[in-house]
A protein has these predicted regions:
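Catalytic cores of RNA-modifying enzymes
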Residues: 1-5, 9-10, 15, 92, ...
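C-terminal structural segments of small proteins and small subunits
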Residues: 71-111, 120
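Short, ordered loop/turn segments at secondary-structure junctions
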Residues: 25, 44-45, 69-71, 88
Length: 122
């Protein structure tokens, strides 16, 4: 099973297990309050939105990952540009399955950045 397929399954499981937060206010509150281990961003989000989330994540020490456009919605069934994953086993499994920065998967580049919020993705 490739990383993207496994990541899709884990993201869906997070939603069903209520370990995911969506929406700008919910995600930002989760990040600032320490309830976010990793933030997944859709590459379809505007540069300003991506920069806003990354700035908040930098300050809070939360890892961010940029996913191919549409992957977040396909995997979770929810529209939106960001998903905050609560700390725990599912977050760790998602971290382990995030693509290595700069590695191409299925013709789309997926990037992960570690902002001091946990294990480095290598």
């Amino acid at each position: 099973m490739d990383r993207e397929t496994k990541l899709r399954g884990l993201m869906g499981l997070c939603v069903r297990a209520r370990q995911a937060t969506f929406g700008e206010d919910g995600c930002l509150k989760s990040i600032r309050g320490g309830g976010c281990a990793v933030l997944l961003l859709d590459s379809g989000a505007s540069k300003a939105t991506q920069d806003k989330y990354r700035g908040v994540c930098d300050n809070a020490g939360v890892q961010t990952a940029l996913l191919p456009r549409g992957l977040l919605q396909d995997a979770t069934g929810r529209s939106g540009v960001a998903m905050a994953v609560a700390p725990g086993g599912l977050a760790e499994q998602i971290r382990q399955n995030l693509p290595v920065e700069g590695k191409e998967e299925h013709g789309q580049q997926m990037k992960s950045e570690n902002h001091g919020g946990g294990a480095s993705v290598e």
